[in-house]
Amino acid sequence: MEPTIDPPLVVASLVFFGILVASFVLWIQHIRRPKNIVREMTTENCVPAWNIGWVNFGIFICAVVTAVFAVQSIASSIFLQPPSESSDPITLTPSLAIFAVLFLQLPMLAVFYAARRFYPGHYASGLNGVDLTHSNALRKAVPLFLMFLPLIWITSIIWANVLSVFQAAGWVEEIEQQELVSLLQAGGHPVAMLLLVALAIVMAPIVEEIIFRGCIYRFLKSQTSLMAAQIISGCVFSIMHANLLSFVPLILVGILLARIYEKTGNLRVSIWFHALFNAFSLLMLFITSMSDAIPH
């Protein structure tokens, strides 16, 4: 019996191989650059610290949490019927996921802009130390994304194996993917799925970069060292995603996003990197979902 060719497996393999080659070439170019150019590229302190003190920062975070909780509570009371003891648990659907994302992201964005609008003395400091257009930011983000993506893959593989050891030892229970990832793999109404993908690629990177890098990282930078601020903000970023399987890889992603923000001096580069990462992850989910050879 002749072996059958699995087209999605071939496409996925070519994509991975292409990214590995591109990453290798970019790292070689980076290493071979003249020292003065490398030193100029790695100069830090491009991002203005957010020195507002713990009290004002605490007020801001409390406002964000309160707004999210209030909006989600109101939305739940309007769109969801309270479950009875005999009813089945609420199943996450694409439409429900869209509302969940919107009612999480929009309140955070609203608090951020309201604070800057009504209390500019504390909350309206500049996010960027370097001016970049969207196209220039994208040109900076693409090579950085290609350079660091294999590092994220390696971290994911190592962490998955560590979790397998923990699971075999009985230290952790069944390891599940993020609910949104499972939902995207399962599929649904095309319009709802497209909206969900758009939120993941467009809205989530913008809001999360503003909050986690533009606010949390810049504040931590004013209180501690750059490396500590990058690590702590990366940990907070990962914890907020509430998934054990992606916990350590997302810490690395959060650290990389903070370092990219710091070294380029413009939040748009981090937003583009984040958008590329989410888009690539969704693309690979789509490809693997069509494969009979790749485990889902």
Question: Where does each model-flagged region fall?
Answer:
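Membrane interface segments of multi-pass transport proteins and intramembrane proteases
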Residues: 80-89, 129-132, 166-172, 219-227
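Transmembrane helix-loop-helix hairpins at the membrane interface
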Residues: 2-6, 13-27, 147-159, 171-296
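N-terminal, membrane-interfacial amphipathic/helix-forming hydrophobic leader that caps
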Residues: 1-140, 282-296
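Internal hydrophobic scaffold segments of catalytic domains
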Residues: 132-165
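Short helix-terminus and kink motifs of transmembrane alpha helices
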Residues: 68-77, 121, 156-160, 164, ...
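Helix-to-loop transition at the C-terminal end of transmembrane segments
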Residues: 30-35, 79-80, 155-169
